[in-house]
């Protein structure tokens, strides 16, 4: 880190930063760091140096070259980063994935072919539409007799090949991360596979963990206070919680679990609850004695009931941390999920509680149901019979559409 006086102001100091980066890795990092540098040029004197690949950038930083390396959260987990630490995290990009298709997923034709290389997203797509034919890229290439041609392509060219096949009507759509979509040569129509907070009647998609983060990494001991203006504390907290949750789960289910952590305003949560007629959330935060339905003596429900409500006495209106975790069986017919909203001060305990709830739920759903000796009047005899586990995460049972 070098410091220069600003021209015309000998008392001002401008921090010089050498940032190491790579060509686009289809994860959104390169584009975001370029925008961040442009937005902060009045504060910092940047030098952006491109290296051939992320491994060489990390090695250069470890050997004393440069000040910072911009990388994704997944690279941070998967590569050798000994001697380095996270200085800060840029504002999080949208982590949800997209369906590249002419139609929304609900309106795809029956038995439409959709390519997706992420196991979690494949299961979520089956939950939405059990009739869809969900294939990996290799399965699709083999299906149309072009597996060798596909395997001979460079990795960065394969997504373009899939898009060309879609334009040739060999498939109806494919699911990719937003970074991969932005790398397409032609920006085709996309549909967000999101949380659907404003439309709870639609199938939701909790994204794979740790997507959308751009980490700025430096050698341990770097004076992080000098670069604080670039960073987003809420993104740092979300990354810490998501990474801790993922590390606490069994490795064999990492590819099957969706995790999403976000800091949200108190008012935003309430407005959303009123739009979706979520009386549970409203009743948790608001004083029901001041709800319009009781003041006027009318039996109102939904948003009208809470129009004149106020937060409960002693209820903090500070931002909240929302945590969502889910997994599905192969066919997408059974989902195990846990979620919690807490204050930022209670974020660690909230994470611990969500983890306990999720693991207990998962364990219970994977147990065999023994035959019940006691009979319950009014219930069919089948109710007491022994049953297999409600959820089997690992058995691969092809759906009828794929068998055909």
Question: Where are the regions that the model predicts?
Answer:
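Secondary-structure junction motif
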Residues: 117-127
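Alpha-helix capping/helix-boundary segments
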Residues: 75-76, 120-122, 180-181
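Short helix-loop capping/hinge motifs at secondary-structure junctions, enriched
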Residues: 104-108, 121, 221-227
């Amino acid at each position: 880190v070098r410091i220069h006086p600003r021209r015309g102001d000998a008392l001002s100091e401008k921090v010089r930063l050498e940032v190491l980066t790579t060509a686009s890795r289809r994860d959104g990092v390169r584009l975001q760091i370029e925008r961040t540098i442009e937005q902060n040029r009045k504060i910092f004197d940047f030098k952006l140096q491109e290296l051939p690949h992320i491994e060489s950038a990390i090695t250069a930083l470890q050997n004393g070259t440069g000040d910072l390396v911009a990388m994704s959260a997944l690279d941070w987990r998967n590569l050798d980063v000994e001697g380095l630490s996270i200085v800060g995290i840029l504002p999080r990009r949208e982590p949800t994935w997209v369906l590249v298709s002419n139609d929304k997923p609900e309106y795809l034709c029956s038995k439409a072919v959709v390519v997706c290389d992420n196991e979690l997203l494949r299961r979520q797509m089956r939950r939405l539409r059990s009739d869809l034919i969900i294939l990996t890229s290799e399965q699709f290439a083999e299906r149309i007799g072009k597996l060798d041609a596909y395997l001979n392509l460079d990795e960065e060219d394969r997504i373009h090949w899939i898009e060309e096949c879609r334009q040739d009507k060999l498939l109806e759509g494919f699911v990719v991360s937003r970074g991969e979509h932005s790398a397409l040569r032609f920006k085709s129509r996309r549909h967000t596979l999101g949380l659907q907070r404003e439309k709870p009647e639609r199938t939701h998609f909790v994204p794979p963990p740790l997507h959308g983060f751009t980490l700025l990494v430096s050698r341990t001991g770097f004076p992080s206070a000098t670069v604080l203006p670039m960073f987003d504390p809420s993104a740092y907290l979300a990354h810490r919680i998501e990474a801790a949750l993922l590390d606490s789960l069994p490795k064999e289910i990492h590819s099957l679990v969706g995790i999403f952590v976000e800091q949200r305003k108190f008012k935003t949560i309430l407005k959303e609850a009123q739009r979706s007629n979520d009386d549970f959330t409203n009743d948790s935060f608001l004083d029901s004695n001041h709800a319009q339905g009781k003041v006027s003596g009318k039996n109102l429900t939904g948003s009208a009931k809470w129009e004149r409500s106020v937060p409960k006495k002693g209820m903090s209106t500070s931002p909240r941390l929302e945590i969502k975790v889910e997994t599905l069986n192969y066919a997408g017919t059974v989902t195990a999920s846990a979620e919690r909203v807490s204050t930022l001060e209670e974020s660690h305990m909230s994470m611990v509680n969500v983890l306990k709830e999720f693991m207990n739920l998962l364990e219970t759903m994977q147990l065999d149901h023994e035959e019940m000796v006691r009979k319950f009047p009014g219930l069919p005899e089948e109710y007491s019979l022994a049953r297999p586990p409600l959820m089997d995460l690992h058995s691969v049972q092809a759906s009828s559409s794929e068998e055909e």
